[in-house]
Amino acid sequence: MVKSQLILGIESSCDETGVALVRAPADGSVPTLLAHALHSQIDMHQAYGGVVPELASRDHIRRVLPLTGTVLAEADCRLAEVDVVAYTRGPGLAGALLVGAGVACALGASLDRPVLGVHHLEGHLLSPFLSADPPEFPFVALLVSGGHTQLMRVDGVGRYELLGETIDDAAGEAFDKSAKLLGLGYPGGPALSRLAEQGDAAAFKLPRPLLHSGNLDFSFAGLKTAVLTQAKKLGDELPARKADLAASTQAAIVDVLVKKTLAALQASGLRRVVVAGGVGANRLLRAQLDAACARMGVRVHYPELHLCTDNGAMIAMAAAMRLQAGREAPNREYAFDVKPRWPLDALA
């Protein structure tokens, strides 16, 4: 009888170090998260106004093994019980990815266990399966983060069709760069969203790029320019109107994300949506998409709020689901294999 598999997942693609343990049942049912631990580098990078790759890599080195110990203790498991060691193969910062790959390969070799490199975006895409109400295939997925904004048709694990993507800045970049223009510090997206709650979203008429383009692509670079222009026009009035400009900026970004997602639903004929990635935690996005989808009779699934950011749980879950689906076999090559640039729709 084939036993369940215990999978250790390691995330180190950018500025969060995450480790998790997932149990994948032999019968193919949804894997179970046993424990996870996460360390954010936000405080370290704040002084620089953004992520410093070298510092990120060094901090991953310091954190990943202690986090592994924490997770094993929380799950009441021994390292020797791990069947597969999974890690984020890409996309991401090359040096940061190599830390996770190196630790995974070292653990795998020392335990004589296979390793499996996981696509970071597939981790986000499948993260709602960690919730109490997991989605069912097929569905439309909105992947929205600091570095990516994509609409995908998802028919199963490893069966992804790109419907549309940003042609310039990602939605998360639009939040962060607009926040920087308003002097809100790092990380900018959450700061802008908090300030927006105090403002009037109708105060400024900002563009909704590509909203009526007839396709499912996004563009946010022009919005950033419009925010800069408006901030300069306000001049000395900016401090008093900053909340209004933040609210108007957030409204423009969310409006485009929601309407493009609805268009993807109509084009595909699907009745389920998954929203994943850091921007998926945005309250306005959730409220507006929930309301619009409720009117259409469409179900919306999100990761738990604490799993919207990068984390090891999504990497362990993606590895478990790929193994269950027979999409990939783990290996004992221990090759430190990473792919800093790696389109999700190229994943078999």
Swiss-Prot record:
Q: Which GO terms describe its molecular function?
A: iron ion binding; N(6)-L-threonylcarbamoyladenine synthase activity
Instruction: State where substrate binds.
Output: 143-147, 176, 189, 282
Sorted UniProt keywords: Acyltransferase, Cytoplasm, Iron, Metal-binding, Transferase, tRNA processing
Quote the record's binding site residues for Fe cation: 120, 124, 310
Q: What is its EC number?
A: 2.3.1.234
Q: Where in the cell is it found?
A: Cytoplasm
Query: Would you name any one GO CC term?
Result: cytoplasm
Cofactor field: Fe(2+)
From which residue to which does the signal peptide run?
none
Give the co-factor note.
Binds 1 Fe(2+) ion per subunit.
Annotated GO biological processes are:
tRNA threonylcarbamoyladenosine modification
Gene3D superfamilies under this entry? 3.30.420.40
Enzyme class at the top of the EC tree: transferase
Q: Describe the reaction catalysed, as an equation.
A: L-threonylcarbamoyladenylate + adenosine(37) in tRNA = N(6)-L-threonylcarbamoyladenosine(37) in tRNA + AMP + H(+)
- Presence of keyword Acyltransferase: yes
Q: What does this protein do?
A: Required for the formation of a threonylcarbamoyl group on adenosine at position 37 (t(6)A37) in tRNAs that read codons beginning with adenine. Is involved in the transfer of the threonylcarbamoyl moiety of threonylcarbamoyl-AMP (TC-AMP) to the N6 group of A37, together with TsaE and TsaB. TsaD likely plays a direct catalytic role in this reaction.
Say which family it is in: Belongs to the KAE1 / TsaD family.
Please identify the protein, giving its name as recorded.
tRNA N6-adenosine threonylcarbamoyltransferase
Provenance organism: Paracidovorax citrulli (strain AAC00-1) (Acidovorax citrulli)
Q: Which gene encodes it?
A: tsaD
